[in-house]
């Protein structure tokens, strides 16, 4: 006995178009029946048959299911093992075997007069039917992809009858849960009218005007299921536009950078995270003996520096900070602008231990050597450049040698005064004290 998709064995189903098919939809490339219904007032168009359809759009064999259309170039049509056979009520799992056949579609002329080829569409045929009815399962054929259920015996043809397009309409392609559809493809008719037709089907059949409603709905479904020539390109452009939109980096304006900086600086000092919008000096001040880490590049980028993540691996956890450090609570004098506040500082000292077996050890050592006390070398280089650089002469003005010396000295003194920390100033004050010779007892 031959199985018919959409028929239950032994069920009482009426003849004709109401023969138990799950859902009936007209597909433009397969059936043109009842064309006069929605062509009133127009000249009747000839009905294409298998022998009279134009070349390039001929489908000599009619599939039981709607097609799968490609909308992205360069994508392979494939299913995982055990997947790819559409759901068909009335066909047992043992007969769920067959192949997908690539149908080359016609070309069309664009607005600028160029010929453009539509991307192919694939149709499913049961094993032993369709254009390769005599082929064995798994045979290497151009434009054929074999699929089968794990329970199907692929050594014998499937016992499924061929579809008669005059009395049997195509079934919308549906797959079992978990099936992965090939990327760059979409199922014809999926998600178009299913959500709109189910809720109102019962109420429409009971109403007095169900015949006119069904006719209008049929007209709507027909026009909605026709694939326009440029539909594949429209979908591809939408996908590419979506990808391009998501891949564009977010631009930060001056106003946004100012807001980010203000948000960081309003946090307590120990909660600030310096970045390229609010650098290290803005968050924690200039480098000196008490804050001696960071070269020029890292001070500028903060945590956005490419080398910072590997240093973050060395940072202690909150538990290690509190339980592995020496802590001292010190009360500070109230600030002048807020004398009513009690200010405390939690002083801490500890160590971070690591050895040469740590992943990325050599890189960590290199980064540490480049950033520890980097401010010392930076100050020395800047001072030497300031003292050795010659001031620009004003055009038409002759400067005396004494003026050059005073300019160099003032520039160097000003730079040193700006870069020294309070600890450095106290050290300079000590050096300015008069020299006292040690007495010999």
Swiss-Prot record:
UniProt entry keywords in alphabetical sequence: ADP-ribosylation, Host Golgi apparatus, Phosphoprotein, Ribonucleoprotein, RNA-binding, Transcription, Transcription regulation, Viral nucleoprotein, Virion
Entry's localization field: Virion; Host endoplasmic reticulum-Golgi intermediate compartment; Host Golgi apparatus
Residue ranges of every copy of the CoV N CTD domain listed in the record: 257-379
Residues reported in the UniProt entry to bind RNA: 105, 121, 163
UniProt entry tagged with the keyword Heme: no
Membrane-spanning intervals of the chain: none
Superkingdom as given in the UniProt entry: Viruses
HAMAP family in UniProt: BETA_CORONA_NCAP (MF_04096)
Quaternary structure and interacting proteins, as annotated: Homooligomer. Both monomeric and oligomeric forms interact with RNA. Interacts with protein M. Interacts with NSP3; this interaction serves to tether the genome to the newly translated replicase-transcriptase complex at a very early stage of infection.
Protein name: Nucleoprotein
UniProt source species: Human coronavirus HKU1 (isolate N1) (HCoV-HKU1)
